[in-house]
């Protein structure tokens, strides 16, 4: 049977759309709770690969909470059930025939199945569907922080026990709920609204799915001490692009771990070269020695240096002063700004 469909709404950030057809008496699929899905559980992928209609393949859940870099909000179910071109939008169901996900993408070097497929979890898809049906668009919650993975090196720098999982706050946006409630750079978020947070993707998705106006409690670690902050979630701005000093011409590369990083004070020429904003003041990386520890750690030409070992370095002189007083044989913590985002990196001796 064929029906004419009307597009109710789309959400490009999750690759989910809702269509409406005029029909009655059609069977419907039951929704499963994807949060209860476990690695190793059997699943079936339904779709039309290569135009072969009503094809079903069997596999298992290979992993949960995957981020594949193909959508802005990702919490993919990874499966080895054969997913090929034409499966996108098809159902991923459990052995009871309940919907656990929507097939979205494959990882392939040949264009065909290689045993790695991804599906949007049913809980995320259901939340998106409800908003598209009710409002024709998706309204996402907003905390207003830049976050990154808490690596073992960063855990050590911020005094977080190795067995504690969390998400590191690298920056706070102006006029955001986080700013108004007292978040600080270097905070490590361990729990959001009663749920433990173990990755940036996990926290990003949790905040986005929070109802605007809801009060939530965020538990974090600051300066090695636990802390709780209560705040009200705001609506995510439409444009989330992260919301002039005189130059002496001097370029420096101090000794020690910073010896392989050459910096200069920002001027109009450097700002234009590296795409910095007129409001960006401080020192910018103009060279990183190839094959050095700094390059291996992720320092790049054009990075704006905001802090060294949590001390602000807004000028060449302040950078030199901090660099000259770094303790020997100890890791150095850098706070950099790259393409509008603040990130922490660790240089190890």
Spans of model-derived segments:
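Active-site loop architecture of trypsin-fold serine endopeptidases
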Residues: 26-28, 46-60, 65-89, 94-136, ...
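Short glycine/Trp-rich loop-beta-loop segment that forms part of the substrate-binding cleft
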Residues: 1-6, 13-14, 33-53
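Short acidic/glycine-enriched loop/turn segments that link adjacent beta-strands
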Residues: 12-15, 85, 340-341
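A generic structural motif
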Residues: 15-21, 79
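C-terminal recognition in membrane/secretory proteostasis and scaffolding
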Residues: 2-9, 20, 38-41, 99, ...
């Amino acid at each position: 049977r064929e029906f004419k469909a009307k597009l109710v709404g789309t959400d490009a950030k999750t690759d989910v759309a809702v269509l409406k057809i005029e029909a009655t008496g059609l069977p419907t699929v039951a929704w499963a709770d994807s949060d209860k899905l476990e690695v190793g559980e059997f699943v079936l992928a339904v779709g039309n690969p290569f135009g072969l209609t009503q094809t079903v393949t069997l596999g298992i859940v290979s992993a949960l909470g995957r981020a594949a870099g193909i959508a802005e909000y990702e919490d993919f179910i990874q499966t080895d059930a054969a997913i090929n071109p034409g499966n996108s939008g098809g159902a991923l169901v459990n052995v009871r025939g309940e919907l656990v996900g929507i097939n979205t993408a494959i990882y392939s070097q040949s264009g065909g199945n290689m045993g790695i497929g991804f599906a949007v979890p049913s809980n995320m898809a259901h939340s998106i569907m409800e908003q598209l049906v009710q409002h024709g668009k998706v309204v996402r919650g907003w905390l207003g922080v830049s976050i990154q993975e808490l690596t073992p090196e960063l855990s050590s720098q911020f005094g977080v026990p190795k067995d504690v999982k969390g998400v590191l706050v690298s920056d706070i946006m102006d006029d955001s709920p986080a700013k108004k409630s007292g978040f600080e750079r270097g905070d490590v978020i361990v729990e959001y609204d009663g749920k433990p947070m173990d990755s940036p993707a996990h926290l990003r998705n949790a905040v986005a799915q929070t109802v605007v106006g809801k009060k939530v409690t965020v538990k974090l670690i600051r300066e090695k001490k636990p802390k709780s902050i209560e705040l009200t979630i705001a609506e995510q701005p439409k444009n989330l692009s992260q919301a002039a000093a005189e130059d002496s011409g001097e370029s420096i590369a101090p000794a020690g771990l910073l010896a392989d990083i050459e910096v200069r004070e920002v001027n109009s020429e450097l700002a234009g070269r590296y795409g910095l904003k007129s409001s960006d003041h401080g020192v910018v990386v103009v060279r990183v020695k190839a094959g050095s520890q700094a390059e291996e750690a992720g320092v790049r030409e054009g990075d704006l240096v905001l802090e060294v070992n949590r001390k602000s370095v807004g000028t060449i002189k302040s950078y030199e002063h901090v660099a000259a007083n770094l303790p020997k044989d100890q890791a150095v913590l850098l706070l950099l700004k790259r393409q509008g985002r603040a990130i922490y990196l660790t240089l190890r001796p």
